[in-house]
């Protein structure tokens, strides 16, 4: 299994250690054809991309592509801000980005006060006490599904990490809307049983993302490969390996704006 592109990497514009150029240099060294710079979205309180730095962010990505000959996608890992599925990018933002990832993160500005308490707080305490109520799982599932339906997301990142949901139902929706399920190499997020169920019961497609917060982890797929081997995963369902490149929903959506 050879990675074609790594679409989930971070830089100091959010929570990463190495620059866009350093990540791109590593991608070139590994022979990757494409690299996604997907820093945390604007609503992340501590480690989010800031609008005042967006022009510099874009310029760094374009320059790195010229310097290293690797296609660099200007991306964002947006935050699901509430059960209604708000994911912080507006259509005015779309022209500035090439890649639209989205996942659940903890320390963000939520859509409403109720979302902060029931969605944000509920998941925080569920993680601390290692127990999620059926109501919370239902709420999280609704948040993921609404985010997919209401936003042209390219992938859902680290599904179920710090946000336990019905992964099968989320994957069904992702399949219907052309959104990838990310297999995240940094975080343990789907059990073997959940992933097997998704493969067997849906037509969802997948991409592998390193979620690299440093250049030395760009292109890292080790933990994902170990899980795939355990469950005899059909590699033809992964669209960023062995020469394949994803057919991203966001790019298709923007053609019709």
Language model features by range: what are they?
Residues 15-18, 47-51, 218-220:
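Short, solvent-exposed loop/turn segments at secondary-structure boundaries
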Residues 21-36, 59-69:
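Alpha-helical scaffold segments that flank or form the walls of functional sites
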Residues 35-46:
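Short, conserved active-site loops that position catalytic residues or coordinate cofactors/metal ions
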Residues 8, 27, 39, 72, ...:
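Divalent metal-coordination and catalytic microenvironments
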Residues 40-41, 77, 105, 186:
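Short, ordered loop/turn segments at secondary-structure junctions
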Residues 14-20, 85-86:
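Glycine-rich anion/phosphate-binding loops
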Residues 47-176, 229, 251-257:
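Extended substrate/RNA-proximal surfaces in nucleic-acid metabolism proteins
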Residues 1-10, 20, 89-92, 112, ...:
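Charged catalytic cores and adjacent phosphate/nucleic-acid-binding surfaces used
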């Amino acid at each position: 299994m050879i990675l074609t592109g790594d679409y989930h990497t971070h830089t100091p514009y959010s929570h990463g250690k190495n620059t866009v150029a350093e990540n791109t240099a590593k991608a070139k060294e590994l022979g990757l054809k494409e690299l996604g710079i997907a820093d945390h979205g604007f609503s992340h309180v501590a480690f989010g991309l800031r609008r005042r730095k967006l022009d510099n962010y874009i310029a760094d990505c374009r320059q790195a592509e010229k310097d290293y000959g690797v296609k660099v996608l200007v991306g964002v890992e947006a935050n699901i801000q509430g059960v209604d599925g708000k994911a912080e990018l507006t259509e005015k933002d779309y022209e500035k980005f090439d890649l639209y990832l989205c996942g659940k993160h903890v320390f963000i500005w939520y859509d409403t006060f109720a979302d902060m308490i029931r969605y944000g707080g509920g998941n925080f305490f569920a993680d601390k006490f290692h127990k999620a109520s059926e109501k919370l799982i239902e709420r999280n599932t609704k948040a993921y599904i609404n985010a997919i339906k209401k936003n042209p997301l390219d992938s859902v990142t680290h599904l179920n990490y710090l946000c336990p949901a019905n992964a099968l139902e989320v994957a069904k929706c992702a399949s219907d809307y052309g959104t990838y399920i990310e297999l995240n190499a940094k975080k343990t997020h789907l059990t073997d049983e959940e992933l097997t169920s998704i493969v067997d019961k849906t037509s969802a497609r997948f991409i592998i993302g390193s979620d690299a917060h440093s250049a030395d982890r760009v292109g890292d797929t080790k933990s994902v490969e170990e899980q795939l081997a355990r469950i005899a995963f059909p590699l033809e369902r992964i669209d960023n390996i062995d020469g394949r490149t994803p057919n991203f929903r966001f790019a298709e959506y923007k053609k019709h704006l």
